[in-house]
Structure formats: C-alpha cells, structure tokens
Amino acid sequence: MRYNCRYSHIDKKIYSMIICLSFLLYSNVVQANSYNTTNRHNLESLYKHDSNLIEADSIKNSPDIVTSHMLKYSVKDKNLSVFFEKDWISQEFKDKEVDIYALSAQEVCECPGKRYEAFGGITLTNSEKKEIKVPVNVWDKSKQQPPMFITVNKPKVTAQEVDIKVRKLLIKKYDIYNNREQKYSKGTVTLDLNSGKDIVFDLYYFGNGDFNSMLKIYSNNERIDSTQFHVDVSIS
C-alpha cells in the first residue's frame, strides 16, 4: 500500500505540473491573440481612414530645423514633421518645392496646435501631371484573381503612395484586417520594378504596436518611375 501511495503522490505532482503548464500555454495564446487583434485593428484604422492621409502639392519646408534627418511642413491646419532614414535624404528636399503623400498619426502631446509625424512620402514637385494606371495582380490563397488598378499622376512616385493605395483596395475588396473571421493572416505587397529590383511590404508587420513604428518602413523614401513597375499581392 505504501508503494502505491508514493506513486500516487508523484502522479498528483505531475498532474499539477501539467495543469500549470497548460494554463501558461493557454495564457500565452490568449495574450498573442489579443495582441494580434489589437494590431490588426490599428493597421486597418491607419490605412482605411483618409483622415490619416497627408496630401499636399508644391509646398516648402519651414526654416525650423530640429534634426538633420527631419523637415517640418505646414499642411492646412497640421504641423507636420517628416522623418527620413538618412540625413542626406532630407537635404535633397530642403528648401525645395515638394509634393507629399504620406500616412500620419497625430502626435500625443500637451502642446498648442495639431502636431503630426510622417516618414518619407515626399517627391520633388513636377509640373508634368499625367494619370497613369498601375496594374495590381492578386493571388488569394495561391489562386490568381482578376487584376485591380491604382492610379498615380506623377512621373516619380514613392513606394509609400503605391503601398497605401494598394492596401486601401485590399481592405475594401478583401477585408484583409477583419478581426471577426481573420480570413487572412499573411500577405505581401511587391512592387515589381522593370529594372529587376523588388520592393516588398509585409501586410501584417505590426512594428511595436504603435502607429509610428508601423510607418517607419517608409523612412527610406524610396521613389520609382511610375511607368516602370507593376504590383503583385499575395494574401493567405
């Protein structure tokens, strides 16, 4: 009887350990799901709503220079700080007329006026305006779908502008950030350049969970020839 009791005691300890481990695993899964749900919602809010979009033509930066890799602009009622990955990029646009097409979230601060931050999204102003249709090929779970199109109106366009316009289409047609069904959890937007280079964006890159970290993917301000690329999208 002692022999059986001793092993019964050990069995209880093992059982308790299994229960604890199961609880920890379950807690981690719940936390991960909650994290993903929040971030999917944030991505949808960021790309879906036009209130987050900064558009401006033929404007110059203000003389107020805070850092060498940032330029400040006044866009309607918004005080906008545009950050770049390298300071030489900001120097290219300093004191020149530029067009802006970028996403921005309002800075959280106790300060007068509305302050916003963006990352890249700038091209030199060009008087040559011409509507160009760019084809967007979509593979939905490896099945090719009818192509979509976005339009741009400049000879040079930023990769950010293209990505924003493509995501808006994907949200509208495929509901890619839907939290109820979560039909999709992986996806890429690939700008396939005729030069042979690809620019790839992860549709489900969350950064640190805040808007600015999600937008830093655009800080290199990559620009491309509007007539020399198409877009490939894969979602699953």
From Swiss-Prot:
It comes from the Bacteria. Residues 1-32 form the signal peptide. Keywords: Secreted, Signal, Toxin, Virulence. InterPro entries: Enterotoxin, Staph/Strept_toxin_CS, Staph_tox_OB, SuperAg_toxin_C, Superantigen_bac, Toxin_b-grasp_Staph/Strep. It is found in: Secreted. Pfam families: Stap_Strp_tox_C, Stap_Strp_toxin. Disulfide bonds: none annotated. GO terms for molecular function: toxin activity. GO terms for cellular component: extracellular region. SUPFAM superfamilies: Bacterial enterotoxins (SSF50203), Superantigen toxins, C-terminal domain (SSF54334). The keyword Signal applies. The keyword Metal-binding does not apply. Belongs to the staphylococcal/streptococcal toxin family. Mitogenic for human peripheral blood lymphocytes. Binds to major histocompatibility complex class II beta chain. This is Exotoxin type H. It comes from Streptococcus pyogenes. The gene is speH.
